[in-house]
Structure formats: C-alpha cells, structure tokens
Amino acid sequence: MARGNQRELARQKNMKKSQEISKGKRKEDSLTTSQRKQRDSEIMQQKQKAANERKSMQTREK
C-alpha cells in the first residue's frame, strides 16, 4: 500500500508544480482577456496571410 500513497503524493506534487508554472506564465503576460484576444487574432491573420501567399506561389509555379 505504500506505493499507492507514494504515487498519490507524487501526483499532487506534480500538479502543484504545473499550476505554479501556468500561473507564472499568466503573470508575465499581464494582458487582459480582450488584449490577449486582439494579439492572438493579429498573429492568426499574419499566419493566414503567409499561408495564402505560399498557396498562391505554388499555383503560379504549376
């Protein structure tokens, strides 16, 4: 039974560690939800534009 307890303690320790890491990432960001959405939408638009350019270059080559 000791192993079951050991596994449980290790699981709790890992969960606590991962929560601290995720909290740290959010604090570094320090953006509001709307600012984060705006930033993410700009990034996605840039990616989409680059993908469209690559696609148009491939169709021109054919």
From Swiss-Prot:
Its main location: cytoplasm. Keywords: Cytoplasm, Nucleus. The keyword Cytoplasm applies. InterPro entries: SERF-like_N, SERF1/2-like. Residues 1-62 are annotated as: Disordered. Residues 1-30, 50-62 have a biased composition (Basic and acidic residues). The keyword Plastid does not apply. Belongs to the SERF family. Interacts with SNCA; this interaction promotes the aggregation of SNCA. This is Small EDRK-rich factor 1. It comes from Bos taurus. The lineage of its organism: Eukaryota, Metazoa, Chordata, Craniata, Vertebrata. The gene is SERF1.
